[in-house]
Amino acid sequence: MRNKLQQAKRIVIKVGTSSLIYPNGNINLKAIDQLAFTLSDLSNQGKEIILVSSGAIGVGLNKLNLSVRPTTIPEQQAVAAVGQAELMNIYNQRFSTYSQQMAQVLLTRDVIEYPESRNNVTNTFEQLLKMNIIPIVNENDTVAIEELDHLTKFGDNDQLSAIVCQIVQADLLVMLSDIDGFFSDNPTVNKEATLFSEINEINEDLFQLAGGKGSRFGTGGMSSKLKAAERVLANQQAMILANGKQPKIIFEILEGKDIGTLFIKGGHESD
């Protein structure tokens, strides 16, 4: 089944805050550089790459010398505004090193749910990919809000990456996190926890196994990743959950190596 990953042409890569920010709050420039190199190389191979990148608030905290994430919405959105600009500046520097053009795409949930604007977003993605430009996507944290009568947030970038995967009809979603894949238990607590190599169906039992929030600077936990996988499988697409500490692991994933957890419809096959 994993050999089919070698044939994936249109690929969405999602990187979490934990892959971009050290636990002490500093920006992991080495990881960002490695990510830019990897995605640029894949683009040169003829792959169509879309990057969904978290990290706006984490980078903003670093830029503003703040050690604690703000609690009020206006403060969080101000930090995100500062961080998004700085994050794109860093990406632009690193991708330029490898002569790869990139573009920023900021989305909110209402834009995707309204058919006309959703169609415009899809057309923009198609045009960027046609021009061999890597779109870098994030939720527009500066304006997105979550209210009962006006819901504009996706929830987190795990959901956003699955939605992007859906609207561009990608072959594969590669979700890079701070964990090696989906385990039978929390591997940081239980050393006997086993890694699922392949999951074909998302059920309540799996959600029971998933628990806890994400990193101090991010929002997504394992339940969020399961929800994203559920959306991906519903659209007959595939998703890999793997550790993003070394972004070049994407090369090995696309070679079909047994890395992380593969979420895909159907059972085990000889291929």
From Swiss-Prot:
Binding site for substrate: S54, D141, N157
Superkingdom, taxonomy of origin: Bacteria
Binding site for ATP: K14, S177, D178, T219, G220, G221, M222, S223, S224, K225
Biological role stated in the UniProt entry: Catalyzes the transfer of a phosphate group to glutamate to form L-glutamate 5-phosphate.
SS bonds (residue pairs): none
Pathway: Amino-acid biosynthesis; L-proline biosynthesis; L-glutamate 5-semialdehyde from L-glutamate: step 1/2
Enzyme Commission code: 2.7.2.11
Family annotation (InterPro entries): AceGlu_kinase-like_sf, Asp/Glu/Uridylate_kinase, G5K_ProB, Glu/AcGlu_kinase, Glu_5kinase, Glu_5kinase/COase_Synthase, Glutamate_5-kinase_CS
GO CC terms: cytosol
Family: Belongs to the glutamate 5-kinase family.
Keywords linked to the UniProt accession: Amino-acid biosynthesis, ATP-binding, Cytoplasm, Kinase, Nucleotide-binding, Proline biosynthesis, Transferase
Species name: Enterococcus faecalis (strain ATCC 700802 / V583)
Record's protein name: Glutamate 5-kinase
HAMAP family registered for this protein in UniProt: ProB
Catalysed transformations (reactions): L-glutamate + ATP = L-glutamyl 5-phosphate + ADP
Compartment(s) of residence: Cytoplasm
GO biological process, one term: L-proline biosynthetic process
SUPFAM superfamilies cross-referenced by the UniProt entry: Carbamate kinase-like
Any Pfam family the entry gives: AA_kinase
GO MF terms held by the record: ATP binding; glutamate 5-kinase activity
